[in-house]
């Protein structure tokens, strides 16, 4: 499945679409917007097109910075992260202050963005970031990187086989697929 990730989401108005938001748009919104069964077969490849910048807005997403750079190198396991770190972020006085008196999302918000992508993470066999401008953001998310869509399709075919079918999920920012047998 190929899908483009727009540079906007419900969580980045007037700020950068940071790596965690790219992840939630891909494996959360785009993957999960279906009825009956996923558009992508179990173990299939999701190719996303996005530059995957390592950009965070410290005014709106301060806890996302720490989540990405401190927690993800340790583990991408949502259950582990929840048990070990969610309360720490939720009760962090600096994050609480920025949430209450500034413009920041709640300190625990990056966890919920990570959880929303969990169903997709458990279903896909591989995610390839086509056009990612660096290697470390896709790697941190557990993805592979391709220079362009042609290279990403070749990588997917080497994983799924030369006769693999390609579905282009061409949708507005948020859509819902109705898939039936």
Describe each model-derived feature in a short phrase:
Residues 8-12, 54-59, 135-138, 174-177:
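Flexible loop/turn segments at secondary-structure boundaries
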Residues 2-5, 16, 44, 48-52, ...:
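Active-site proximal loops enriched in glycine and acidic residues that flank catalytic Cys/His/Asp
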Residues 10-15, 89-95, 129-135:
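Generic detector of short, locally flexible boundary/turn motifs and exposed helical patches
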Residues 115-181:
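Extended hydrophobic packing segments that form well-structured cores
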Residues 1-24:
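Accessory "access/gating" subregions that flank catalytic or transport cores
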Residues 22-126:
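C-terminal catalytic subdomain
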Residues 2-5, 9, 40, 44, ...:
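Structural signal for hydrophobic packing residues in well-ordered secondary-structure cores
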Residues 16-17, 61-63, 181:
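Short, glycine/charged-enriched secondary-structure capping and boundary segments
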């Amino acid at each position: 499945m190929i899908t483009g990730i727009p540079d906007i989401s419900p969580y980045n108005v007037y700020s950068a679409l940071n790596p965690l938001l790219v992840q939630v748009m891909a494996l959360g919104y785009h993957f999960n917007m279906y009825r009956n069964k996923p558009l992508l077969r179990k173990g299939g490849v999701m190719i996303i097109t996005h530059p995957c910048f390592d950009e965070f807005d410290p005014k709106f997403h301060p806890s996302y910075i720490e989540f990405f750079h401190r927690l993800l190198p340790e583990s991408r396991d949502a259950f582990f992260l929840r048990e070990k770190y969610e309360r720490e972020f939720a009760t962090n006085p600096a994050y609480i202050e920025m949430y209450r008196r500034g413009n920041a999302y709640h300190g625990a918000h990056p966890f919920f963005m990570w959880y929303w992508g969990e169903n997709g993470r458990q279903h896909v066999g591989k995610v390839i970031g086509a056009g990612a401008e660096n290697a470390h953001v896709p790697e941190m998310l557990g993805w592979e990187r391709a220079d362009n869509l042609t290279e990403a399709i070749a990588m997917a075919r080497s994983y799924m086989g030369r006769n693999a079918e390609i579905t282009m999920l061409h949708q507005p920012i948020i859509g819902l697929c109705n898939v039936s047998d």
